[in-house]
Amino acid sequence: RAFLLSLTNATSLGLNSKFVFLENYKYMFRDEYFILALKNTLKLMAVVPIITIAIALVLAFIISQSDLKERGLYRTVFYFPNIISLTVVGIIWSFVFHPTMGILNSFLNGVGLHGWAKSWLGDGSTALWCIAVTLIWQATGYYMVMHIAAMDGISSEIYEAATIDGAGPVRKMFSITLPLIKDIIGITFVLALSGTINLSFTLSKVMTGGGPNG
């Protein structure tokens, strides 16, 4: 039904509508703001899910292979950003990237890199990547927990046999862990892709007001 409506000039009242076929789509792709938004979304989709899942896998492997009593604590700490309201996450990172009071610029100025300090969210070349960093930080813990659950289902005897054969952590991860949980990785990647599309708009509104300098 939604697609059929898109082929008409129907308004919210739905009065006197008629078919215009692909005219709405032609208008949409002639809109420079739509094209810019589409490009930015595609950039985020190409970067955020891959980095998020990669970091989540590494953290999950480290925690699942450790014998630390604090494993539960680490899970909670890394998962915590995912339970915070996305608006709050955006506000927190807006302060991190703030041009005068931000942690990032304060650090750069503190170590003498004054030329690197800038208005991160006010610059079109960096605002998108600030949003990407925020998305990665917010979602990594969620996928880490999912991967830990999958890794904990792998028999410890397989790892013990690999240790006897002289395999190190990296070899174990690439030869044992990743192949055995590849189905879960596929699922989490699709979820990360969907999450990037759904959450990027909210973060861009909160952090930049819809674009650099609002």
Task: Describe the predicted segments one by one.
Residues 1-214:
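A structural signal for multi-pass alpha-helical bundles of membrane permease subunits
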